[in-house]
Amino acid sequence: FKVNVFHWHLTEKLAWRFEVKQYPQLTANANMTRYPGQYYTQEQCKELEAYAAERGVTVIPEIDMPGHSDVFTKAMGFGMQTTQGIAALKNILDEVAKAFPLAPYIHIGGDEVTLNDGFLEEMTQYVRENLGRKVITWNPLKNKAVASDKADMTQMWSSSGKKIADMPNIDCRYNYTNHFDVYADLVGIYKSNIYYQQKGDAEVAGTISAAWNDTKVKTETDIIKQNNQYANILASAERAWIGGGKQNIEVGGTKLPNKGEEFEEFADFERRFLFHKAHSLKNEPIPYVKQTNVHWRITDPFPNGGDATKVFPPEQNTDDVLPTSFIYDKKLYNTSFATGAGIYLRHIWHSIVPSFFSAPADNQTAYAWTYVYSPKEQQVGA
């Protein structure tokens, strides 16, 4: 598979996962609030980077600064933007560079926190001049403009992120898989172009599939399954390598067309992915099953006046086969044909990403139904 970058987010507010020999308190049990004491040694980092390099994969280590740094502040007794904090971060970056000798870039974060004047500029200068590496930051920053004095590449993480001229930008704004439905959002990834373009260029470097395991789950396997990790990564990689995508997800959304070119292209991707699920990935935890053969009828939304228990004609109908339209309060309510195992009536990012309903609103009730074939009479759970 043509996946050529592993972005390793090594620090967060809950835990610090990178061994810093000069500051062992960062990885002490008492200073982590999730999975205390679990971290990667520098030897493990070197080993993983070498393993990745043999397979054509570049590792991008990230030490997020100065935000997402609760563990740092707790362990060190001072914040990252203090004089002591800046000195400590430079020592930490020295160790990061030694643990990742092949990494052309070091990611220094910068997001979701108010930046002091000169902080990112000083850290960027240090990485460039003292470590000989290039710098990646998140985009946007909270209170500063991203510019060449702060980064050599940016990673767009929200809808307000815009590409910065004269440097490469990674677009992962709508590729946060921890928000995703297993089925509908895979369609969105595959249908969408990357940053409104058919092909990459000097300013659009590609995309990254980001699995933020902010919510604690029972096992690491659950992270892979619940993020539909394999399918999402391979859909992202294919779109990044071959380009295309009829339109951006901000226009096309996650709705799978019932027929046509986009449907045929996705069906072909699905066929190839399910082949790998059955063969080269047969031992991996993959929840995805074929969805291009799943069809629904979905009603126009009925106004419920804020009462979600209110009953409408589809529930009152006793026919074996439901009709394709209903009369309620002297008004005609039609149904629409839909394809796919997951249908967003309103997307989690509904103000930006279109869904099945063009204008979803509060206090509405809609009905969706499909038919399930069973080769024998049996009872199943729902």
Model-derived features: where do they sit?
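Hydrophobic faces of well-ordered beta-strands that scaffold small-molecule active sites
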Residues: 4-8, 59-63, 106-108, 135-137, ...
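Active-site beta-loop-alpha junctions enriched in small/polar residues
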Residues: 11-13, 64-68, 111-113, 140-143, ...
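Flexible, acidic glycine-rich loops studded with aromatic residues
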Residues: 148-150, 158-293
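Short beta-strands within extracellular/lumenal beta-sheet-rich domains
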Residues: 360-373
